[in-house]
A protein has these predicted regions:
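Extracytoplasmic thiol/disulfide redox context detector
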Residues: 2-141, 224-225
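Cysteine-centric redox/oxidoreductase cores and disulfide-bonded domains
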Residues: 137-239
Length: 239
């Protein structure tokens, strides 16, 4: 009897030791799993925070610009010229037409959809020079972002400027027709959309990355004042 009892005790002791060992192993596994999950969650949170902070830094950098530096020769309010020699190069032997417009004007966008491409094509073919002059007639936030980016592209990537210009107006036309002001009445949203349009029309990313949110306030004041004071045949006195 004594031997049987001792054997049972030994078995129970061994079983208890095995249970305790398994419990310790389970605890270690739980600790490892919790630690790994915690590290992963913290890494995800840190990554998201970095992306958000980086995006805010990019926006602030695009907001805090020197318009004179960004716009270069266009800072004085001059138009973008299109002619047979390219963008920014008028042919002095040809007559020069001037088109005044606002990137947030639906009538301007409709006009561009109807005849804009033809006008710039004829200028490129040498029938005339055309001055394409952004002014304020409506003045939504989209006008500011679009004008700023347009003037950057005119300097840094003139070969894509004409396509970009028409695409900017085409986008506004779609938003007006849809009665959707979500983007065009918000400066940051307009800036992001303008960058997308630029990329879609072939503007290099290193140029797109330099687009300011808005460097056009003084430019538009100057160009609008010049337009209002211009002697334009057939125009009334309502401006």
């Amino acid at each position: 009897m004594g031997n049987k009892s001792a054997k049972k005790d030994a078995v129970r002791l061994k079983a208890q030791q095995m249970r305790q060992a398994q419990e310790r192993a389970d605890r270690r596994t739980r600790i490892i799993v919790i630690s790994v999950v915690t590290v992963v969650v913290l890494a995800v949170v840190a990554s998201v925070a970095y992306v958000i902070l980086r995006q805010r830094a990019i926006i602030e950098e695009a907001r805090n610009v020197d318009p004179a530096s960004v716009l270069g020769d266009y800072a004085d309010g001059r138009p973008v010229v299109v002619g047979p020699n390219g963008v920014g190069k008028a042919d002095p032997s040809l007559p020069t037409l001037t088109e005044y417009f606002d990137y947030s004007c639906h009538a301007c966008a409709d006009t561009d959809a109807a005849i804009g491409a033809q006008l710039t094509q004829w200028a490129e073919q040498g029938r005339y020079n055309i001055e394409i002059q952004s002014v304020t007639t409506v003045g939504m936030e989209y006008q500011k972002a679009a004008t700023s980016a347009s003037l950057v592209v005119a300097q840094k990537d003139p070969d894509h400027w004409v396509a970009f210009h028409h695409a900017l107006l085409a986008y506004f036309r779609t938003q007006f027709q849809a009665s959707n002001g979500t983007v065009v009445q918000d400066l940051e949203a307009s800036w992001r959309q303008v960058k997308t349009i630029a990329s879609e029309t072939g503007v290099p990313q290193d140029v797109v990355d330099t687009f300011p949110l808005n460097a056009s306030d003084d430019y538009l004041k100057a160009s609008t004042a010049a337009w209002q004071g211009a002697n334009v045949a057939g125009r009334g006195s309502s401006l």
